[in-house]
Amino acid sequence: MASSSFSVTSPAAAASVYAVTQTSSHFPIQNRSRRVSFRLSAKPKLRFLSKPSRSSYPVVKAQSNKVSTGASSNAAKVDGPSSAEGKEKNSLKESSASSPELATEESISEFLTQVTTLVKLVDSRDIVELQLKQLDCELVIRKKEALPQPQAPASYVMMQQPNQPSYAQQMAPPAAPAAAAPAPSTPASLPPPSPPTPAKSSLPTVKSPMAGTFYRSPAPGEPPFIKVGDKVQKGQVLCIVEAMKLMNEIESDHTGTVVDIVAEDGKPVSLDTPLFVVQP
């Protein structure tokens, strides 16, 4: 195989081109050389190069003032599609590489929107705990009410503390009987109030007209209004009943002698509770 080069140099008037073609022994040609002449513009410089190829031979043709080289056109045709195919493959690779990333970003954004809607749903409803599973992802939304575990140990500790005073209270009653021993002497020292007790049902009583707290004296530290055995007149003040932070004086509705004081000083009384037993 051999290569051929063609160079054309023309003066201002005209130029001549010599084209020599070489062929192999396999393809015999009768006329081995031809002469082609045509006019060119001022001072053109043209150079035609053809590289050796195993499958084709350089051929120069001149038809209607046009020169074409088969080898160079073939080379252009071969180079063009190969570069286009390479670009297409690269673009496919880039698109295939970027498509999964876009898919994952879209799925993540959709999942986040679902999470926000679920959080709003839990806040607006009486839902304590919500669990969501999607593909390989698991989401759990819990309120503070669903986490009572840290408070449970504190409650057990508080339950143990009241138990200790209870034992002390149980141990205290044995000392009370010793102090209760002198108590029997007090009932013995007050025999007079005991006789009228059987006749209480038949004697008239002064009842409380309202609910409140019963007080025998007008103020703390002062002597009581009446005592057992005192004679009272109708309309005389016997005690005070505090109701709604008001001190209400209770008067006797008849004249007589105070036989018994039923209510206890400083204790609450209800409506129509007997306060005194007054014998006419």
UniProtKB/Swiss-Prot annotation:
What protein name applies here?
A: Biotin carboxyl carrier protein of acetyl-CoA carboxylase 1, chloroplastic
Which Gene3D superfamilies does this entry report, sorted A to Z?
Answer: 2.40.50.100
Pathway per the UniProt entry: Lipid metabolism; fatty acid biosynthesis
Name the domain of life this protein comes from: Eukaryota
Q: List all Pro residues biased stretches.
A: 189-198
> What functional role does this protein have?
This protein is a component of the acetyl coenzyme A carboxylase complex; first, biotin carboxylase catalyzes the carboxylation of the carrier protein and then the transcarboxylase transfers the carboxyl group to form malonyl-CoA.
Q: Name one GO molecular function term.
A: acetyl-CoA carboxylase activity
* Presequence boundaries: 1-82
Record's keyword terms, sorted: Biotin, Chloroplast, Fatty acid biosynthesis, Fatty acid metabolism, Lipid biosynthesis, Lipid metabolism, Plastid, Transit peptide
Which locations, inside or outside the cell, does it occupy?
A: Plastid, Chloroplast
Q: What ranges does the record list as Polar residues composition bias?
A: 52-75
State a single Pfam family of this protein.
Answer: Biotin_lipoyl
